Amino acid sequence: MRILVSNDDGILAQGIRTLANTLHRAGHTVTVVCPDRERSATGHALTMHKPLRAEAVENLFEPGLAAWAINGTPSDSVKLGLDALLGERPDLVVSGINCGANLGSDVLYSGTVSAAMEGTIEGLPSIAVSLASRVRCDFQPAADFLVRFVRALEVQPLPEAFLLNVNVPALPESEILGARVCRLGMRRYRDQFVKRVDPRGVNYYWLAGEVIESEEAPDSDVVAVGEGCIAITPLKYDLTYEPGIGLLGARQWEKIFDPLAGG
């Protein structure tokens, strides 16, 4: 299988090296195209006002594995890889392994998820994979699971291209209690901007904060990971709120555009 691998933690991150090398050893043709530095929480941003540069990377991954570092975002990396760098169209796009969970509303900010979503936009099945810890970062169990997961998708391909958001609990493989297909949870944060002053007396701010503990639906990704299971959540780029179509459609919006209407 031809697989394009990207991430948002950058080319030097251990997560992408573990993922790409493990897929390569499993017999897949792997090409890495990812940011040249940390680009977490950049969402689906694209670089529009400066040129993108791609630098071939050697001696970082296993022999026979092609890799490129891009001076852009995760979405830039996948888009440039598909349109300019890869000789053949891949069968699959995989983004990760992220250091830290991407659960619930995290997916709206996540560069990891956005890199995979770019593959979906281009009509390719895509997977975003994250390790649900920023402290205990043994990526190998997540990489081994992904190899088995990709093998299962080869045997029984998805009927259409969509994104699978995979979150793996930071546990030894023997302690992971299976995998669940689930929906997005809430995952809200209590944000805090820490104000500081630089040597010139100018204020600057760091974004900090913590997760707000709240009741989650039992079929959510947040609950699955919290109970020691791998969470697999299908996602699509269509963000339409379907009930809103009916709610808004029942109103007489044409009056807004009628200059003869009262008001």
UniProtKB/Swiss-Prot annotation:
Gene3D superfamilies referenced in this protein's UniProt entry, alphabetically: Survival protein SurE-like phosphatase/nucleotidase
Record flagged with keyword Cytoplasm: yes
Primary location class: cytoplasm
Superkingdom per UniProt: Bacteria
Residue positions binding a divalent metal cation: 8-9, 40, 98
Assigned EC number: 3.1.3.5
Reactions mediated catalytically: a ribonucleoside 5'-phosphate + H2O = a ribonucleoside + phosphate
GO molecular function: 3'-nucleotidase activity; 5'-nucleotidase activity; exopolyphosphatase activity; metal ion binding; nucleotide binding
Compartments reported by the entry: Cytoplasm
Cited NCBIfam families: PRK00346.1-4, PRK00346.2-2, surE
UniProt similarity note: Belongs to the SurE nucleotidase family.
UniProt-recorded name of the protein: 5'-nucleotidase SurE
Organism: Gloeobacter violaceus (strain ATCC 29082 / PCC 7421)
